[in-house]
């Protein structure tokens, strides 16, 4: 077996990392010599392939001169190495022992035959050596000619073999990425000290060797099997090339499309380091709006440094021309919102047409709540996510919550049924998430309390413990006041935000309603004392219903302990620290995100025929489209073309329906007859605020979420993540190999048949 040395009376295992083990050679003549010297009768009837695959000899059975250590990480066996050091007698001292390996007893005739065979082989090798020297002396010009031919040939045999070898390594890495197999195998603390265990990459490599892949088998035939075949450094270099080549396939399509938008998702943990996922939106050659994941940006705490690195990565590393960027959006939690706003403003300074917008995948109310710079709001949002995740851990927990809802809503069964359906979804991302939370709060508290205090021991200690922690969090008066204030403040933006994620006509008309929304919020701010009094009363009544004590936050009480002059009431405290900053921030955030340019762009949606119809074809796109004039192929004919576009749809046939989305308009058979309209629709389509109509082309974000959900934090890799998320993108193995050779190896460094490469031990 591969785990044990095949030599008689040798009990060494290949899991010993301090001792090299070698495969039996596949060459029949050499393999036969190894078998004869081993004196193993049970090995004589096995083929060289079987011996190579299943049997090993440790380095103790070879002369020291036969083993080469070209570096601390390279151990190779010479091509002519034959094992000669064996212990064939120690078992005689213990005749009752049961040996796994039977030693063959040789007769005197067999011994004489072996000796004569060795003498004949030695004389034969000497004769061949003399003939070779004579031939070289007589034909020196032939050697010169061969050297000239090698210069003419594009690749030597060694170079071709090296390329095939590298191609096999790249195939394994791509497979691991697509199937989400981590590079590392067992955890370091799982492996006993002194034992060698191959990582997942080497395990797949050995599998291909044992399956008969000639290139790999030839490369590692004389290599110690209990050492790493490919170093961590080489794996990292190759993964970077895989990532770059696969990303380039997407970036090539983006460049062909010219215009694009940049979107970042919430900060994620990749092997202990914070990264920003970056996605790109563009319209491909088939007129489909696509949103693709293109990589991670290491997060920086300093906003200015982050802005510089973000710009550098997009323009220099990825080669995108930001002059063609028409939109930017950032989905981040409250702790990172202010920093990403700095990034957006720095990009806008350099590229005014890269409009800062909301992202269609995030509800406006949740986006606004995450951006509020109040610690209590951040804590509340985190608690809400944890509660939702807790109940989605198992169907039994959701069923328990359903039962509590049924009891509480006995008199309103329809509403109870609706709430159950909502609880089974990811409701924390809804526009009305805070309304739902306030309505469900009693059910959540009772359910969590019941799970924690269950006497039937239906839940394990972890579930019961988490229920206790979450119950304490949602039963805190600070949490209750926070969600009630958010519910009421964001009620003014709920309809507006919902329309932004609706049909194209809804988005168009929403742009015109922003003024009314801001007017309402400003009125709230002017009368904040009155509004806050109502909000605080609602929070107090809810706390009383749940038997929760009304009190100031513990951190405030501790800070003012012993201060007799502090007569601040709970109501006034929450007005100054929660209600006022929340309303002020939301007003300012709406003004920032819906800039004049952004609103002008949304007004251009009147180009969509269904919107034209609702406006009775009395539209004025030309005025709003001035900001995109430089993007048009024929700007001088825009006015006439828009007139023809309106006439086309105004006088259409009765059986022809008006296209209701940009997606439908872009796929019209005659859209190319309106080149300016086509260009405008493409630019509007890629704005992050616009919904991706065909879900087939929104895979980047979904696959990113799936990768993060299914992969442990310490096993995540930014390189492998890109391969996994973009598993359907074509890849050019030859390009990857050529790139690797160009970057990391020179012609003189390519390994030959006489210097087999083995990597880190």
UniProtKB/Swiss-Prot annotation:
Phosphoserine found at: 566
Source domain of life: Eukaryota
Disulfide bonds: none
GO BP term, example: signal transduction
UniProt-listed Pfam families: Dimer_Tnp_hAT, DUF4371, THAP
Biased composition annotated in UniProt, kind: Basic and acidic residues: 116-132
Molecular function GO labels: DNA binding; protein dimerization activity; zinc ion binding
Keywords: DNA-binding, Metal-binding, Phosphoprotein, Zinc, Zinc-finger
SMART domains per UniProt: DM3, THAP
Residue intervals of every THAP-type zinc finger in the record: 1-86
Gene Ontology cellular-component terms listed: nucleus
Subunit architecture: Interacts with DNAJC3, probably sequestring it.
Protein's name in the database: 52 kDa repressor of the inhibitor of the protein kinase
Organism per entry: Homo sapiens
């Amino acid at each position: 077996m591969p785990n044990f040395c095949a030599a008689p009376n040798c009990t060494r295992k290949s899991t010993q990392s301090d001792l090299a083990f070698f495969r039996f050679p596949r060459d029949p003549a050499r393999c036969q010599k190894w078998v004869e010297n081993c004196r193993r009768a049970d090995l004589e009837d096995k083929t060289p392939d079987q011996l190579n695959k299943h049997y090993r000899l440790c380095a103790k059975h070879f002369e020291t001169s036969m083993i080469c250590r070209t570096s601390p990480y390279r151990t190779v066996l010479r091509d002519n190495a034959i094992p000669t050091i064996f212990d064939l007698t120690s078992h005689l001292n213990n005749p009752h022992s049961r040996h796994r390996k039977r030693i063959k007893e040789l007769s005197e005739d067999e011994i004489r035959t072996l000796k004569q065979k060795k003498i004949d082989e030695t004389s034969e090798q000497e004769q061949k050596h003399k003939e070779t020297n004579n031939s070289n002396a007589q034909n020196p010009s032939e050697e010169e000619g061969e050297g000239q031919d090698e210069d003419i040939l594009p690749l030597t045999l060694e170079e071709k073999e090296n390329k095939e070898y590298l191609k096999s390594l790249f195939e394994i890495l791509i497979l691991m990425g697509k199937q989400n197999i981590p590079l590392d195998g067992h955890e370091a603390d799982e492996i006993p000290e002194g034992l060698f265990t191959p990582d997942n990459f080497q395990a797949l490599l050995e599998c291909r060797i044992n399956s008969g892949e000639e290139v790999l088998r030839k490369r590692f035939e004389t290599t110690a099997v209990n050492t790493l075949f490919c170093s961590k450094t080489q794996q990292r270099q190759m993964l970077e090339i895989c990532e770059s080549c696969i990303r380039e396939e997407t970036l090539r399509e983006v460049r062909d499309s010219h215009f694009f938008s940049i979107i970042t998702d919430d900060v994620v943990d990749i092997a202990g380091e914070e990264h920003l996922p970056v996605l790109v939106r563009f319209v491909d050659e088939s007129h489909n709006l696509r949103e693709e994941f293109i990589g991670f940006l290491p997060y920086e705490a300093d906003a200015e440094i982050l802005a510089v690195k973000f710009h550098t990565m997009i323009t220099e590393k990825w080669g995108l021309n930001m002059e063609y960027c028409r939109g930017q959006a950032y989905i981040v939690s409250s702790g990172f919102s202010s920093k990403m706003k700095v990034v957006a403003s720095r990009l806008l300074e350099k590229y005014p047409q890269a409009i800062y917008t909301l992202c269609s995948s995030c509800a406006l109310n949740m986006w606004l709540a995450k951006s509020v710079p109040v610690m209590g709001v951040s804590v509340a949002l985190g608690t809400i996510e944890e509660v939702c995740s807790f109940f989605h851990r198992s169907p039994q927990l959701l069923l328990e919550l359903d039962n509590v809802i049924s009891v509480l809503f006995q008199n309103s069964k329809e509403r109870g049924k609706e709430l159950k359906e909502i609880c089974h979804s990811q409701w924390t991302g809804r526009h009305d998430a805070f309304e739902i939370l306030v309505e469900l709060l009693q059910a959540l508290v009772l359910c969590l309390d019941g799970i924690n205090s269950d006497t039937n021991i239906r839940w394990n200690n972890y579930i019961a413990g988490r229920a206790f922690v979450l119950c304490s969090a949602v039963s805190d008066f600070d949490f209750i006041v926070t969600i009630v204030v958010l519910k009421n403040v964001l009620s003014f933006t709920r309809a507006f935000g919902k329309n932004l994620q609706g049909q194209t006509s809804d988005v168009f008309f929403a742009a015109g309603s922003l003024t009314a929304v801001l007017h309402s919020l400003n009125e709230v701010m002017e009368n904040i004392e009155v509004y806050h009094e109502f909000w605080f009363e609602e929070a107090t009544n809810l706390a009383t219903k749940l038997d929760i004590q009304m009190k100031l936050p513990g951190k405030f009480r501790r800070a003012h302990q012993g201060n007799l002059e502090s007569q601040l009431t709970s109501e006034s405290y929450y007005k100054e620290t929660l209600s006022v900053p929340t309303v002020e921030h939301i007003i300012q955030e709406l003004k920032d995100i819906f800039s004049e340019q952004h609103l002008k762009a949304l007004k251009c949606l009147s180009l969509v025929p269904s919107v034209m119809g609702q406006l009775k074809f009395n539209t004025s796109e030309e005025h709003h489209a001035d900001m995109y004039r430089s993007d048009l192929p024929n700007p001088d004919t825009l006015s006439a073309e828009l007139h023809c576009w309106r006439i086309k749809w105004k006088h259409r046939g009765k059986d022809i329906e008006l296209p209701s989305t940009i997606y439908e308009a872009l796929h019209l058979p005659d859209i190319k007859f309106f080149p300016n309209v086509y260009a405008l629709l493409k630019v509007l389509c890629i704005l992050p605020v616009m919904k991706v109509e065909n879900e087939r082309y929104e895979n980047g974000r979904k696959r990113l979420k799936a990768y993060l959900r299914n992969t442990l934090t310490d096993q995540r890799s930014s390189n492998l993540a890109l391969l996994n998320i973009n598993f359907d993108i074509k890849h050019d193995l030859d390009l990857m190999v050529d790139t690797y050779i160009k970057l990391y190896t020179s012609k003189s460094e390519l390994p030959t048949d006489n210097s087999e490469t083995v990597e880190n031990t």
